[in-house]
Swiss-Prot record:
Cell compartment(s), UniProt: Cytoplasm
HAMAP family, sorted: EF_Tu_A
Organism from which the protein derives: Cryptococcus neoformans var. neoformans serotype D (strain B-3501A)
Binding-site positions, GTP: 14-21, 91-95, 153-156
The protein, known as: Elongation factor 1-alpha
Annotated stretches, region: G5: 192-194
PANTHER family (UniProt xref): TRANSLATION FACTOR (PTHR23115)
Name of the encoding gene: TEF1
Amino acid sequence: MGKDKLHVNVVVIGHVDSGKSTTTGHLIYKCGGIDKRTIEKFEKEAQELGKSSFKYAWVLDKLKAERERGITIDIALWKFETPRYQVTVIDAPGHRDFIKNMITGTSQADCAILIIATGIGEFEAGISKDGQTREHALLAFTLGVRQLIVACNKMDTCKWSEDRFNEIVKETNGFIKKVGYNPKAVPFVPISGWHGDNMLEETTNMPWYKGWTKETKSGVSKGKTLLEAIDAIEPPTRPTDKPLRLPLQDVYKIGGIGTVPVGRVETGVIKAGMVVKFAPTNVTTEVKSVEMHHEQIPEGLPGDNVGFNVKNVSIKDIRRGNVCGDSKNDPPMEAASFNAQVIVLNHPGQIGAGYTPVLDCHTAHIACKFAELIEKIDRRTGKVMEAAPKFVKSGDAAIVKLVAQKPLCVETYADYPPLGRFAVRDMRQTVAVGVIKSVDKTEKGGKVTKAAEKAAKKK
């Protein structure tokens, strides 16, 4: 794997039977991090089970099964390379918590690949009012995934028909436009994830296909295959210039070292000697050292999963869901309340003021009350449709005032995207998603450790 290649994260979305696993499996199998030994092992098992038509989806099923059982998988298995990028598939849906993962997800996707089955009836099912295709695309857009690639899969099942492809492009264009994407900036690639047509190499089965084009602010790019479309993703900018925000995933107590919080740097930089503040617990202390993969590093940057050692802080003072920031540069604070744009995905009844589901925002998992429904809006244009509605139901978008039932630290989506989007969970499913528009922060005194005071004097 090329160490120096730029990393991009993609999420693969689409209807249940669109062929997501086969297509993703194919890319990982052909350009990825699965070593020959593992592949041979899988092939042997497949033959023993009479699955000798060993196809790529099986690679993914194996990986998924291991992941479901909680075996941590060598993450390289979910990676593949293009000429420019090292690509990580963040999550292939079909996973129970796909929607939740996409929102609180360990990483933000830079691009979504929407897989559409072109078979007669299949396409129509996926794109119908309640189809997952629509929900996934809406979700990706709401959560700030601004780049999209559409792969029209299973072209072999419709005899590689140009008319069918054009019909699907036309329909899909209409629907992604409604969601908010600009169809001109979206490459459409006709593929067969099973046979491999237009995946890595140009197909000979569709002589009519002249290639895809996409127009963005940075110009026009063209290509033939899905791999080329992925290679044409606009390089993401990582927010190192923003103040530090690091939501804690865990806090460990390590003998001889002390308290070690662990989490992913979302914005900014963390380094030894910094005086950091944890919100909403309001503890301020000095960072003694930062490490990644059990090695000390000079600094942790956005996207890095780091552990850092803090002085004079007990494991009781800080916990998962707390947010670490620089005490001298826009430190994080507790949110007394916050206003958010919420889109209701699937709730069986009506949601009114007083509704108190659980919110998953970054690593926090806390009950929040819908204190007030401020206005109902058109989710595409943002125009107000009704002031102070009594209720909202599935499909509606509204601006809502939320109050956490326990201390919580969140930020606006505009300032700190990963801390400004959330999933609303109830009845063991994601009933809504939200993007935070404004936060009412509370100032209150907290614990300042001796180490922090000393560090402050040194300066």
